[in-house]
Amino acid sequence: KLANANIDELGQQALASNDNNQLNQDNLKSMVSREQKSSYQSLKVKKLEANSLVSTAEAKYLNLWQRQIESSGDRIILEDGILLEGQRVQIIATIDSLGNLIRSEIAFSSGVREIDLLAIKILNESAPFPAFDPLMIEEYGFIEIVRDWNFSSG
């Protein structure tokens, strides 16, 4: 019984040690996540919409971004062979100053799951985007682009 008690006791100690390690890892992940959110929130984000008044640097950036999205989108739509008849979806893309896609989401759904997933796929596969112009970097660290996409087969 004493040997079994020691084994059980060691087993419980090992289990407790593993639990403590897991808690420490969870706490560390939580702290890192909070720091990332805090870092993201502390930087300025410029929101660009379809009818935003934009500076020349922003207008050029949006033009480059749109051309890159359209090139990738045309290729992906051909590959996927999805029927696109007058589908509309509104997307939000958050991009950092290096051109990395930080977040992609659907603001307004098309109502067709395949189309919404296609829009997200196009965003993700189009990244990375061009880095910001130095003038843009002086003003903000991220841009949030809100766009309506109208899908059609033709």
Report the location of each language-model feature.
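Extracytoplasmic/secreted envelope proteins and their assembly/folding machinery
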Residues: N4, L62-Q66, E70, D116, ...
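Short, small/polar residue-rich loop motifs at catalytic or cofactor-binding pockets
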Residues: L84-V89
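A short, highly charged nucleic-acid-interacting micro-segment common to nuclease
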Residues: L48-A59
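Conserved "boundary/linchpin" sites in short secondary-structure elements
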Residues: L15-E49, R67-G73, D96-F108, I120-G154
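Short amphipathic alpha-helical segments with a strong bias for extreme N-terminal helices
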Residues: K1-S17
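Surface-exposed patches in mature extracellular/periplasmic domains of secreted proteins
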Residues: I77-I82, P134-L135
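A short acidic/small-residue loop/turn micro-motif
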Residues: F108-E114
